[in-house]
A protein has these predicted regions:
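Charged substrate- and nucleic-acid-binding regions of tRNA-handling and nucleotidyl-transfer enzymes
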Residues: 1-51
Length: 51
């Protein structure tokens, strides 16, 4: 959820939270259900790779 995304990425509410949420939704559609640790790792990698 958005609160967890903000905590993990240490970001305030805003557009980036929605983008991260969409990334996780797409990831789940592509890969199927993931455990929390794998999802967090993917989220952090996605965030670090952003321009």
């Amino acid at each position: 959820d958005g609160t967890a995304i903000m905590r993990i990425l240490d970001i305030p509410p805003g557009r980036e939270v929605g983008e991260a949420y969409q990334f996780l939704l797409n990831l789940r559609l592509d890969r199927g259900p993931m455990d929390a640790a794998s999802a967090e790792e993917a989220l952090r990698a996605w965030w670090a790779a952003r321009p």
